[in-house]
Amino acid sequence: MYKKIPYQTGRQLLDRFSSSDEAQALIDEELNIDDSIEALLENELYFDLVQFLAHGLPVREAIWWGAHTLDARNDVWSAMQKQCISTAKAWVKSPSEEQRRKSELFSNKLKLNCGPSWLAQAVFWNGSGSIVAPDLPNVLPDPFLYSKAVAGAINHSAALPNWDKTDEYYKKSIGIALELAKGSKA
């Protein structure tokens, strides 16, 4: 059902990040992706499910998901935070080293203290280029580092700045991810 998540079992994804004890207990070696997602949803383990989906989706889909999820908080973002989101969208549409390095500058300026800065970091860590200064020998990021940053962007924005719509935000966010996982362009 989720053609953009190229894994057989939920455990393959769950082992890629630090999940809650509840998620660990729910997803055994045999549980397929669809049933793993359903179990996390039914138990309202949204924090875990966001990490699960961020690690399951391909890089561009994951970053696109993060950008569209963060749009839900657009009323609280500063001009620079909004630029992080628009730069991430631009990178997804037309990946370039220029956009990747621009995202690095945004994440550095914002010091990873908000959801949009984590989204910018995800673009920088996407795996297409070095994560050190351009004049140094190339150092590529760990394979799923961008996933951790996308999950960080979404989960951070669910809580901060404070508000009373966290569950609604998570449900909308997860809906976007599941549509992307099915192959939609959301």
Residue locations for each model-derived region?
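Short, glycine-biased loop/turn motifs at secondary-structure junctions and
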Residues: 1-112, 128-129, 134-135, 140-186
